[in-house]
Regions:
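Small-molecule-sensing regulatory modules
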Residues: 2-53, 60, 68, 143-324
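Short, Asp-centered acidic motifs that coordinate Mg2+ and/or phosphate
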Residues: 80-84, 170-171
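Alpha-helical segments flanking ligand/cofactor-binding loops in enzyme cores
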Residues: 73, 121-122, 162
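A conserved helix-loop-strand patch within extracytoplasmic ligand-binding domains
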Residues: 87-90, 96-148
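Short, well-ordered beta-strand segments
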Residues: 12-14, 83, 101, 131, ...
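Short, structured active-site "lid" loops
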Residues: 56-82
């Protein structure tokens, strides 16, 4: 890729202070340095509400935006030039003055089970305790294994991983992408992958925000954008937005490009699997749709309508009642 001439000498990246967040921000910084020789990229650590309170349930301290609002505010105030987010944490409704300028290529979307003794979800004895902070994971776990117990855990990746490694819990579930980025994937005993175990909206992807009117920064970010990932994310996030859900509801979605196969799918299509779960895994509504790659928003809108037609709204309402 040819380098782009630059006018700015320094670009400031706003990031959370966790090891994973800093890894992700540094990865973006290195990509920018490679695309734009001479650009000085610096990281600015910003503490978010979700980082400050590591004990309360996420829903109890405000739900959506807990890991993003302060960083977005820093961009708006001109304290930093861009924000790097884990897209699964980024609310679908944000400040109009910000734009999701780049979505780099996506990591593996799978979840990961760490069960040092029993190895797999199927082998865990009845009554086993599995730790997670996600209602989506909780719902799918209880749907697959109603005889296990789900414990709510908080903290950074290493803290949650150690709950299983130290035997405090029988297993924990984390995102494969985060473990891989931190070179901790050796501890994974089972990948929980789609279509059997669906990921969160945006899981495995990073999102880079900047100010809408900052055309210089938008030009710098353009080489980092991956079109297949960006359109997949757009389809998933449109579905979530139309269902008026946040990152805490038990909803899963997985979009990806597909080509012609033995099932007769048309070339150049975008496929989207999505599901909404009862918080306790007793019921769920799921659908699979395809549409033109050129219109991921429309695919997301169609998916939201399909899930509502299948009975998703009562399941979402149960979640809202539990988290308010």
């Amino acid at each position: 890729m040819s380098s782009t001439p630059i006018k700015r000498l320094t670009l400031r990246i706003g990031t959370r202070g966790s090891r994973l967040a800093r890894w992700q921000a540094e990865w973006v910084a290195n990509r920018l340095r490679g695309c734009h020789p001479g650009l000085n990229v610096v990281l600015v650590e910003i503490h978010t509400q979700g980082d400050r309170d590591r004990n309360s349930l996420l829903a109890a301290i405000g739900g959506t935006g807990l890991f993003t609002k302060e960083i977005q505010r820093a961009v708006l105030d001109g304290l930093v030039d861009i924000a790097v987010h884990s897209l699964k944490d980024l609310p679908t409704q944000g400040p109009d003055e910000l734009v999701l300028a780049a979505v780099p290529g996506r990591e593996d979307v799978a979840d990961a089970l760490i069960a040092p003794v029993h190895q797999t979800l199927q082998a865990l004895p009845a009554g086993s305790q599995i730790g997670t902070s996600s209602l989506r994971r909780r719902a799918q776990l209880l749907h697959l294994r109603p005889d296990i117990q789900v414990a709510t855990i908080r903290g950074n990746v290493e803290t949650r991983l150690n709950q299983a490694l130290e035997g405090k819990l029988d297993a924990v579930i984390l995102a494969w992408a985060g473990l891989h980025r931190l070179s901790l994937h050796r501890h994974v005993t089972q990948r929980l992958a789609p279509p059997d175990f669906l990921p969160a909206v945006g899981q495995g992807a990073l999102g880079i925000e900047c100010r809408v009117k900052d055309t210089t920064t938008r030009a710098l970010l353009l080489p980092l954008d991956d079109a297949p990932t960006h359109r997949a994310i757009l389809a998933e996030r449109t579905t979530l937005a139309e269902l008026e859900g946040g990152c805490l509801i038990p909803m899963a979605a997985w979009a990806r490009d597909i080509d012609v196969d033995s099932d007769g799918d048309q070339p150049g299509q975008l496929a989207l699997d999505a599901a909404v779960f009862d918080p306790d895994g007793h019921a769920h509504v799921a659908a699979t749709l395809t549409g033109p790659r050129e219109d991921p928003r429309e695919l997301g809108l169609r998916m939201a309508r399909a899930l509502r037609a299948g009975g998703a709204e009562p399941l979402l309402e149960r979640t809202r009642q539990r988290t308010t």
